[in-house]
Swiss-Prot record:
It comes from the Viruses. It holds the Pfam family Benyvirus_P25. InterPro entries: BNYVV_p25/p26 (IPR008419). It comes from Beet necrotic yellow vein mosaic virus (isolate Yugoslavia/G1). This is RNA-3 uncharacterized 11.6 kDa protein.
Length: 101
């Protein structure tokens, strides 16, 4: 599982271009001093919302259960954060899985 396709959405409106990335370590990503944003994608009603925070060290994968207007939307988003630097918005590959998986 090297290449993962993903896309960043601008608050559920216009999608950014999806990028393909290979990670040496898929569990921990080091920013090497660059400022990165960890973006959690929360899907609800087939829309995507960005929730992010700045991080200057390391970012671990986080599996989330979406809770937007729900209580739950029934999807989990596994977030993978690319190396990036401000003010550009990171592209983030994701894989959506059902709750049964």
């Amino acid at each position: 599982m090297g290449d993962i396709l993903g896309a960043v959405y601008d608050l559920g409106h216009r999608p950014y271009l999806a990028r393909r990335t290979v990670y040496e370590d898929r569990l921990i990503l080091s920013t090497h001093g660059n400022i990165c944003r960890a973006i959690n994608l929360l899907t609800h009603d087939n829309r995507t919302t960005l929730v992010y925070h700045n991080n200057t060290k390391r970012i671990r994968f986080r599996g989330l259960l979406c809770a937007l207007h729900g209580p739950y939307c029934g999807f989990r988003a596994l977030c993978r954060v690319m190396l990036c630097s401000l003010p550009r918005l990171c592209d983030i590959p994701i894989r959506l899985v059902d709750d049964d998986d």
